[in-house]
């Protein structure tokens, strides 16, 4: 399996893990993740036991067909899609509206529409390009905790 497919699958499991964690801990607690071919990181004030429980449950549920766990409304893909759409909408609106107040109004309108569209389009981008729930042979190998100052980071290594 190539590095991109591994990253997509780890990204999906990262989303599933964080989704389950967020359903079990206070909602005001910040959390983030980052995936690579060998596994993924979770940054947040959670215990290794909580990470292990959530990651293993997410993997089992995804292997049982719960593909929606791989998609997250908080994913960075949505931010990138929103930024790209807003930039394109602003530039096109200003250019087509003509320079001056009319162009500025059109640019702002286009940017607002682009930001509103970013979540559903970001979801499609996640489904097609950046995540995958297709992980029948995936295994969690190890979970390692690191403390960097105030930040708790867990590394979840996986294999296929």
Where are the regions that the model predicts?
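Short Lys/Arg-enriched alpha/beta "domain-start" segment
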Residues: 1-10, 16
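Catalytic cores of large soluble enzymes that bind and process phosphate-bearing ligands
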Residues: 5, 9, 46, 50, ...
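Cytosol/matrix-facing juxtamembrane amphipathic
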Residues: 13, 17, 27-43, 117-160
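Conserved, well-folded catalytic cores of nucleic-acid-processing
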Residues: 20-24, 61-65, 92, 128-135
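Short, charged cytosolic
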Residues: 34-61
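Transmembrane alpha-helical segments and their cytosolic interface motifs
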Residues: 66-93
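Alpha-helical transmembrane segments of multi-pass membrane proteins
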Residues: 87-91, 111-123
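Hydrophobic alpha-helical transmembrane segments
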Residues: 96-113
